[in-house]
Amino acid sequence: MAGEFSRTSRIGDQLQKELASLIQFEVKDPRLGLVTVNEVRVAKDLGYADIYYTVLGKDDQPEVLAENQAALDSAKGFLRRRLAQEVKLRVMPHLRFHYDQSVVNGSRMSALIDEAIRDDETKNGNEDE
């Protein structure tokens, strides 16, 4: 059972929890919206951590996304220092923030599926008459 999860994935999960808390309660940047940390991928050598995030309700506004990216980039040093205090690692990875497109892509796919279902229903309804 212990071999199922790699060390880097366990570290990524821990960093995700800590980052979510730190961003919500300790980062005091007015540019920062309601950020959700979706995933943290840590390199095998712990040299860097890729943090994938979304912003609640602002997926379609590029200027808001750019402001959030700038706020997170400016808070990297603070977040890394606080993570080093909370998570006991010999080396704390460098943080790289990326906006997570998967939520936007998922909602777009869901809309396309709903549209296809409606089209099928209207076609089937016309054929029955």
Swiss-Prot record:
Entry superkingdom: Bacteria
PROSITE patterns per the UniProt record, alphabetical: RBFA
A single Gene Ontology CC term: cytosol
Residues in the signal sequence: none
GO molecular function, one term: ribosomal small subunit binding
Keywords from the UniProt entry: Cytoplasm, Ribosome biogenesis
Annotated function: One of several proteins that assist in the late maturation steps of the functional core of the 30S ribosomal subunit. Associates with free 30S ribosomal subunits (but not with 30S subunits that are part of 70S ribosomes or polysomes). Required for efficient processing of 16S rRNA. May interact with the 5'-terminal helix region of 16S rRNA.
Family, as annotated: Belongs to the RbfA family.
Protein name (database record): Ribosome-binding factor A
Annotated source species: Marinomonas sp. (strain MWYL1)
